[in-house]
């Protein structure tokens, strides 16, 4: 389940989809998951998006203006990458609504990994996205189905791969989480296929503000605070591209993400992981031990 997104449906159950979302997982309690019999994208929508690309990456499911939407990457190349939006048409099934941004039009390399959030203070809807061309932010229309007319794309985090070929300060997989007065921007850096891939974070008091790491250095310059990592040779390696944070029935908060398993029967796969996330005295997130278990 690479690049997962999780949401709680109207029936109270939790659903998870990931890159190439031809199936979904369902859970009653966040701890025990099974394969759902619901296809998350209807057949006509599969036909529509397949005419644009055969790579469907990193979905993000969220509620905008009272409707549940799915944002997803349609990837052909770093230059020809697009973000599409789908709307829930029946419980946990989504229908294609269109492309909302195209990398060929904006010039932003790797227009991928969308994360959409509504600012409760202003009601404005924002999309964060990107990878090797930097993490960008842009305002969406109120209904979340298009870029707001006249909106500007702003680079907010991460160096480009041209500035940092080893990707240690190149970010992707944005996820935003509100906690005690701050917006936390979780990102992943490194190469997703090896141990260098890791989860990091910065924060800002406003969605439109500057995101900083623990030392006060700007994420736009490639700085972030580590949350989860692995070392070369670890059985669980390359943790990152987190999904959402939820509070479970035990009262603890858990973060979801993908991770490689070295001794797996499917070594190329990236199963779904979850870890308990805690907050230190300065309200910075951490995971005990700093590694997936």
Kindly label every feature range from the protein language model.
Residues 1-293:
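Carbohydrate-active catalytic/glycan-binding domains of CAZyme proteins
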